[in-house]
Swiss-Prot record:
This is Predicted GPI-anchored protein 23. Residues 260-282 form a propeptide. Residues 236-264 have a biased composition (Low complexity). Its main location: membrane. Probable cell surface protein involved in the process of adhesion and early events of invasion.
Length: 282
């Protein structure tokens, strides 16, 4: 048993040596492997660190480029926005200026139209006032003409009346009519005449006259006074009357014609004279 164990042990050592599986050799091999593993780990760590650093560098560069691009895009956007805002402000200012110009032009046109309308209204008012004055003047002229015609007619009427009065006065002065005849009450006068007297007797007088005249307008005043006195033998009842008449005419131009007939008066006077002579003879 011991021999077999020894033989086995003796035979294992050379085999283990040949196979490099001795315990000492394993320790060394382990150190080498550890060193190799450490070296590989260091290299891997270095590669990893380098890769991480490169990745970080790339990421940083990409981030920086992205930031730069973002900043550039933001700047461009801000520039575009500012330009658009400036263009909008310019357009707004231009539109406001155009609107103000249009408003000013419209206001000026409205003022011009208003002034024209006011001028036309004033012209129409002046024309209407002138036409009214002309019509008033024409009406006044027509009224004046009517007054002139009325004055002429009145003047003609007054002139005719003056002719009639003159004719009556002529008949009185001529001795025809009641003014120059004998009557129981004395003498009588016409044309605003008064008479006074007393006496007795009988007599008749007839007088007629006509007058016509024309002339300018004037005023006519006339006074006729007749006074009578009776005389004759007392108790005979015969009297004669004498009358006096005066007529005054002022500011009257015209012509008149008068005629009188006193035949009957003269006949009566003659009869009275015959009767008186007969009584004297008796």
């Amino acid at each position: 048993m011991r021999v077999s164990t020894l033989v086995l042990s003796t035979s294992i050592i050379p085999i283990a040596t040949a196979l490099n599986i001795s315990p000492f050799h394993n320790i060394e091999k382990k150190d080498i492997l550890a060193d190799a593993a450490s070296a590989a780990g260091g290299a891997a760590a270095a590669v990893t660190s380098g890769a991480v650093g490169a990745a970080n560098t790339v990421a940083s560069g990409a981030a920086g480029a992205a930031d730069t691009a973002t900043s550039g895009a933001a700047g461009i956007a801000n520039t575009v926005a500012s330009g658009a805002a400036g263009a909008a402000d310019t357009a707004t200012s231009g539109a406001a200026g155009a609107a103000k110009t249009a408003t000013s032009g419209a206001a000026g046109a409205a003022d011009t139209a208003t002034s024209g309308a006011v001028g036309a209204a004033k012209t129409a008012t002046s024309g209407a006032a002138g036409a009214a004055k002309t019509a008033t003047s024409g009406a006044a002229g027509a009224a004046s003409g009517a007054e002139t015609a009325a004055g002429a007619a009145a003047s003609g009427a007054e002139t005719a009346a003056a002719g009639q009065e003159t004719s009556g006065a002529g008949s009185l002065v001529g001795g025809s009519g009641s003014s120059n005849s004998t009557s129981p009450s004395g003498g009588s006068g016409s044309s605003n005449g008064t008479s006074s007297g007393s006496g007795s007797g009988s007599g008749a007088g007839v007088g007629s006259g006509s007058g016509s005249g024309s002339g300018s307008r004037g005023s006519i005043t006339g006074n006729s006074v007749a006074t009578g006195a009776s005389s004759g033998p007392a108790g005979l009842g015969i009297s004669s009357s004498i009358s006096q008449s005066t007529t005054r005419q002022l500011q009257t131009s015209g012509s008149s014609n008068s005629s009188s007939s006193a035949g009957m008066g003269n006949v009566v006077v003659g009869m009275n004279a015959v009767a008186l002579a007969a009584l004297v003879l008796i």
